[in-house]
C-alpha cells in the first residue's frame, strides 16, 4: 500500500530574512510585524502561542544576554521550552517601546495571517505563506543544519516523532549523502 506524504510549505532562511529586511524598523505596525515574524521563526511557536504572550512576561527575558529560554504551555496543555534569539529579543524590545497593551501582540490570528501574506508579497516571495510556515521553516532549517530529528521534535513540542516526520523531505537528501560517504 502506498501512502501519500503530506507536503508542507516552508521558506528558506534567506527568504525569511528577506521578509524581515523589507519591514522598515520604524512605526508601530512595522515594529509589531517585525517582532512577530522574528518570534515565530526564532521560537517555532504556533501563532496561538505567540499571540498569548504578555508584555510583562517578556521584560525579564529581554534583560538576559544572548539566547533566552522561556517555558510555555503549548498545544494539548503540554509544557515545553522555547528559545528567543538575540534578534527576536531586539525586535520585541523595539516593539515594547511603543506597545502599551497587556498582550505582546494584541492582534487576532486572522490579522496575523493577513500581515504575513502582505509582508511576504512585498518581499517578492511567491510561495504560500502563513504564520505556521515560519514554524515549518525553522524546523526545516534546523534539520538542514544537521540537528537530529528527535531534538527538532522536542523543540517543536511534538508528542510523537511521527508528527515530525513530515520534515523527512529534508532528511532524505542527507541520508543519501551519508550513504555515499560510508559506502564509496
What is each PLM-predicted segment?
Residues 1-184:
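Conserved catalytic core of the tyrosine transesterase superfamily
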Amino acid at each position: 500500500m502506498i501512502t501519500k506524504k503530506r507536503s508542507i510549505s516552508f521558506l528558506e532562511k534567506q527568504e525569511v530574512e528577506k521578509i524581515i529586511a523589507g519591514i522598515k524598523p520604524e512605526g508601530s505596525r512595522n515594529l509589531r510585524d517585525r517582532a512577530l515574524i522574528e518570534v515565530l521563526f526564532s521560537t517555532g511557536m504556533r501563532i496561538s502561542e505567540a499571540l498569548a504572550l504578555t508584555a510583562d512576561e517578556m521584560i525579564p527575558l529581554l534583560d538576559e544576554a544572548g539566547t533566552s529560554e522561556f517555558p510555555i504551555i503549548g498545544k494539548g496543555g503540554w509544557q515545553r521550552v522555547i528559545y528567543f534569539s538575540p534578534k527576536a529579543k531586539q525586535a520585541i524590545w523595539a516593539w515594547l517601546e511603543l506597545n502599551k497593551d497587556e498582550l505582546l501582540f494584541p492582534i487576532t490570528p486572522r490579522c496575523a495571517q493577513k500581515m504575513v501574506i502582505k509582508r511576504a508579497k512585498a518581499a517578492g516571495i511567491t510561495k504560500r505563506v502563513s504564520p505556521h510556515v515560519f514554524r515549518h521553516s525553522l524546523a526545516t532549517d534546523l534539520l538542514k543544519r544537521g540537528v537530529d530529528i528527535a531534538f527538532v521534535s522536542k523543540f517543536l513540542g511534538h508528542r510523537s516523532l511521527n508528527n515530525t516526520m513530515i520534515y523527512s523531505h529534508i532528511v532524505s537528501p542527507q541520508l543519501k549523502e551519508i550513504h555515499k560517504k560510508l559506502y564509496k
